[in-house]
A protein has these predicted regions:
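Conserved active-site "lid/cap" helical segment
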Residues: 1-63, 67-75, 79-82, 168-180, ...
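N-terminal extracellular/periplasmic Venus flytrap/periplasmic-binding protein-like
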Residues: 12-14, 25-34, 42, 182-269, ...
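Active-site-proximal alpha-helical scaffold in enzymes
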Residues: 86-118, 173-202, 262-269, 334-335, ...
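Condensing-enzyme catalytic core mediating Claisen C-C bond formation in acyl metabolism
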Residues: 1-26, 38, 232-297, 301, ...
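Active-site nucleophile and cofactor-binding loops and adjacent substrate-binding regions
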Residues: 64, 83-92, 252-256, 282, ...
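Flexible glycine-/small-residue-enriched beta->alpha junction loops
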Residues: 111-171
């Protein structure tokens, strides 16, 4: 093991807002600023001690130049702080953490903030032929959220977009013979866990309240929105969302959401020099890639790779966070690795909480750290699937 490993000294996320919900009045850069500021404060360092900020963002259209730079300056960090925006679809926030680790390990930087941010509610529509002009007939609008975030780029449909990610979730369900009933049961449990975690204080360590300015006074958002919009009794009766006789529904798919998450990383020696107590050590990270149409099972490979890098066995890991882009994604990883559900997403996952795509990779890592801290667990693995056939994973060990 590295004698001077990279450690995480703080981790924070916003509550997750529903589509056009509580957080929709803020841009992604506003949400990013909230978590960058909170992560620096919770780390116990001065803003001018951060050398670089890496933030994932999948839907940057309409936000202006360099969203990560905007978020950095809005957070009160000085103009001397470098900032980079990353796009690896749903893995953007986690890849930011992985690259922060590597920057520090290479000696390029000493203190880095890494995470992700997304306001899916504010993703604009695009006019593809607007620059050259529409000479005659009907024009076309493309939904930036769908086209650049939620549709497969390798299988174009007649409407100009790509195949919906949900169609590939149906393929995954068929491959593993996951029934509608099994997926519904998974979603119901995820919803129960997420609601309970919001109510019993399980998320208190990891979340930062978001203040929304308004003419009638500020509104403070302190808990995840979507778990309290769900009527569990309706889940078994929902229509299939993607295929007429399919098994995947809106309840077993992650919801369109807004949110952000960030972590502060440095070497262990740097933390000691500053008198800081790390939250955890980043033991290993991995990327796994395969055919685009099978992104749903890519976390299986990413988890296998990160466990091998860490020198761990599946059973030696106390908790897992495996992003629920669809229930079948997490179910497949659990089945392939023989992981019991009581070790996975113990506070609920994205089918209940929501999936702000640029932020989710960092969000699952922050939530993993919070869950390990609450339960007294030591080892954890966070992973998520990525459109295009990829997945990432990070292994951490609590300090």
């Amino acid at each position: 093991m590295d004698s001077d490993p990279i450690v995480i000294v703080s981790a924070v996320r916003t509550p997750i807002g529903a589509m056009l919900g509580a957080l929709s009045g803020l841009e992604a850069t506003d949400l990013g600023a909230v978590v960058i500021k909170a992560a620096v404060e919770r780390a116990g360092i001065a803003p001018d001690q951060v050398q670089e900020v890496l933030m994932g963002c999948v839907l940057p259209a309409g936000q202006g130049q360099a969203p990560a730079r905007q978020a950095t300056l809005k957070a009160g960090l000085p103009p001397s702080t470098g900032a980079t925006t990353l796009n690896k679809v749903c893995g953007s926030g986690m890849k930011a953490v992985m690259l922060a680790h590597d920057l520090i390990r290479a000696g390029s930087q000493d203190v880095v903030v890494a995470g992700g941010m997304e306001s899916m509610s504010n993703a604009p529509y695009l006019v593809p032929k607007g620059r050259t002009g529409y000479r005659y007939g009907h024009g076309t609008l493309l939904d930036h959220m769908a086209y650049d975030g939620l549709e497969d780029a390798y299988s174009k449909m007649p409407n100009g977009g790509g195949k919906s990610m949900g169609l590939f979730a149906e393929d995954c369900a068929n491959k593993y013979h996951f029934t509608r009933e099994a997926q519904d049961a998974y979603a119901l449990e995820s919803s129960r866990r997420a609601r309970t975690a919001n109510e019993d204080g399980s998320f208190a360590w990891e979340t930062v309240p978001v203040t929304i300015p308004g003419r009638k006074g500020d509104v403070v958002v302190e808990r995840d929105e979507s778990p309290f919009k769900v009527d569990p009794s309706k889940i078994p009766h929902l229509r299939p969302a993607f295929v007429k006789d399919g098994t995947v529904t809106a309840a077993t798919s992650s919801s369109i959401s807004d949110g952000a998450a960030a972590l502060v990383l440095m070497r262990q020696s740097e933390a000691r020099k500053r008198g800081l107590t790390p939250v955890a050590t980043l033991v290993a990270h991995a990327t796994f890639s395969r055919e685009p149409e099978w992104f749903t099972v890519a976390p299986v490979g990413a988890i296998e790779k990160v466990l091998a890098k860490a020198g761990w066995q599946t059973a030696s890991v106390d908790l897992y966070e495996i992003n629920e882009a669809f229930a079948v994604v997490t179910m497949a990883a659990m089945k392939e690795h023989g992981i019991p559900h009581d070790k996975v997403n113990i506070h609920g996952g994205a089918v209940a909480l929501g999936h702000p795509i640029g932020a989710s990779g960092a969000r699952v890592l922050v939530t993993l750290l919070g869950a390990l801290k609450k339960t007294g667990g030591r080892r954890g693995v966070a992973s998520l699937c990525i459109g295009g056939g990829e997945a990432t994973a990070i292994a951490v060990e609590m300090a």
